[in-house]
């Protein structure tokens, strides 16, 4: 007879927070409502997290780990810049669609009134994402895939990041009804024709 693995309380709290953020778009989540959702006292929440800011940090940590570990796998599996960029952008859109509550955190929607450090953390998430794209484009140029690039790699990376962030904002604005992947194939085709004209 196999024993069910017990989920750590810390993880249960983060899952409940993400769920509350998804189910209550536009609303602030209080520790009182969160403790009710988890089924523990507020004191029990604070035994695992010193503050609500630490809970949000836990969700940011999860997003960073999930996205950037997968990006590293994509870089190992594919060598051409166009495929790498396409898969990395798609990855973030899929992650967002599957984790609407965390999307609210990454876009800073629920961080108003929280510590400045949290806004800096989500800023770093997108900066790191954009830097990764820029590096891919530069490596592609060195291998002459861009021959030479129609646009500067920094501008191209910024354009891709802006498109994805914009799609995530639309997803949030629709209260998670309009998928960020809704027109992605066509959008990517139009964008890649500009960024990779020789492909």
Where are these regions (language model features)?
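Helix-turn-helix
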Residues: 12, 23-54, 58
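Amphipathic alpha-helical packing segments from all-alpha helical-bundle domains
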Residues: 65-68, 72-73, 116-143, 154-158, ...
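N-terminal intrinsically disordered/low-complexity leader segments
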Residues: 1-8, 72, 144-145, 173, ...
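Hydrophobic alpha-helical connector segments
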Residues: 58, 73-98, 153-160
């Amino acid at each position: 007879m196999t024993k069910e693995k017990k989920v750590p309380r810390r993880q249960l709290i983060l899952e409940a927070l993400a769920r509350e953020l998804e189910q209550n778009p536009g609303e602030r989540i209080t520790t009182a409502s969160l403790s009710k959702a988890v089924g523990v006292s507020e004191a029990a929440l604070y035994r695992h997290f010193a503050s609500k800011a630490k809970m949000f940090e836990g969700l940011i940590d999860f997003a960073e780990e999930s996205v950037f570990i997968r990006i590293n796998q994509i870089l190992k599996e594919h060598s051409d810049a166009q495929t790498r960029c396409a898969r990395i952008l798609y990855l973030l859109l899929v992650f967002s669609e599957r984790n609407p509550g965390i999307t609210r955190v990454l876009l800073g929607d629920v961080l108003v009134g929280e510590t400045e450090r949290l806004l800096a953390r989500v800023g770093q998430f997108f900066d790191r994402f954009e830097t990764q794209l820029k590096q891919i484009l530069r490596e592609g140029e060195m291998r002459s895939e861009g021959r030479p690039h129609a646009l500067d790699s920094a501008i191209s990376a910024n354009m891709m990041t802006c498109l994805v962030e914009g799609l995530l904002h639309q997803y949030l604005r629709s209260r998670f009804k309009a998928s960020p992947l809704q027109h992605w194939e066509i959008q990517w085709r139009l964008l890649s024709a500009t960024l990779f004209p020789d492909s």
